[in-house]
């Protein structure tokens, strides 16, 4: 069974967690800590597969910062004060933990490797607008310990290839996966405080996302973001053509006010 630590001094949250039949959800009864220091001491003394946090804003920020330094791959679950909501979040967490512990490769994957794979799956879902709301995106990024800031402006670019290209339709076995891995290697750079992420989505859509990282100051004004990002993207497009023979071009590029604008309800 999975082990969960609850960090909160809110009695309503504690009561909600105490009311859950945790064994039925695949968890042991959660350990509880009331402060940042108690939570860190518990993590040091006892194994935990995840932590649920409901602390005042300043304490929450401090605990997240300390976790990033010492436990960067420990999933962080929201801690609601209603039993039904706790159960929903626990099921979401269990799904993540199952993926983190799955045998997905013949290679020796570490927890960090597994989390990176799962994190990319979450980002692909977000870029495909399959995450229902902005609140879900914020919760998701916290759960998978992403360093990307969901509250600040980001750049989205859509690439296209010639209609005659058959790279994604049969020229190569696993064409989309092969192309996405190549793009992740070539576009995995940072420019002016923006980290670039690439995904190949259904419908032969190739999407690049440039977003700021938590704790890093933005070097760009919102109205200049596309101009600064365009040049390194064009350079990477040249490398893609050189190594894979794929003639990509930028079909569209625009700035979103935040990652939360990629939620499904924002597209309606």
Predicted feature descriptions by range:
Residues 1-131, 148, 193-195, 235:
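Alpha-helical/coil-rich non-catalytic "connector" segments in signaling and regulatory proteins
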Residues 84-208:
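Interdomain helical linkers/hinges and coiled-coil/dimerization scaffolds
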Residues 22, 138-142, 241:
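Residue-level preference for well-ordered alpha-helical positions
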Residues 30-32, 76, 154-156, 198, ...:
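Conserved beta-strand scaffold positions in the cores of enzyme catalytic domains, especially
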Residues 37, 61-65, 91, 135, ...:
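Generic alpha-helical secondary structure signal
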Residues 1, 151-153, 247:
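A structure-centric signal for secondary-structure junctions around beta-strands
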């Amino acid at each position: 069974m999975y082990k969960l630590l609850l960090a909160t001094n809110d009695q309503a949250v504690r009561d909600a967690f105490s009311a859950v039949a945790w064994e039925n959800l695949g968890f042991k009864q959660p350990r509880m800590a009331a402060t940042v220091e108690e939570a860190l001491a518990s993590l040091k003394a006892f194994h935990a597969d995840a932590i649920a946090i409901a602390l005042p804003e300043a304490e929450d920020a401090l605990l997240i910062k300390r976790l990033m330094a010492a436990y960067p791959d420990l999933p962080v679950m929201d801690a609601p004060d209603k039993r039904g909501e706790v159960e929903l979040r626990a099921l979401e967490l269990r799904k993540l933990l199952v993926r983190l512990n799955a045998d997905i490769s013949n290679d020796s994957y570490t927890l960090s490797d597994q989390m990176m794979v799962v994190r990319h799956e979450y980002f692909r879902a977000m870029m495909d607008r399959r995450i229902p709301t902005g609140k879900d995106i914020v919760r998701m990024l916290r759960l998978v310990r992403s360093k990307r800031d969901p509250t600040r402006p980001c750049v989205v670019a859509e690439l296209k290839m010639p209609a005659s290209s058959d790279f994604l339709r049969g020229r190569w076995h696993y064409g989309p996966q092969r192309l996405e891995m190549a793009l992740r290697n070539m576009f995995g750079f940072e420019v002016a405080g923006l980290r670039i992420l690439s995904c190949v989505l259904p419908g032969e859509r190739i999407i690049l996302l440039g977003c700021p990282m938590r704790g890093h100051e933005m070097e760009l004004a919102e109205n200049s973001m596309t101009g600064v990002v365009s040049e390194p993207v064009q350079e990477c497009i040249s490398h893609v053509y050189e190594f894979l023979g794929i003639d990509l071009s930028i079909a569209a590029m625009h700035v979103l006010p935040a990652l939360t604008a990629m939620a499904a309800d924002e597209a309606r």
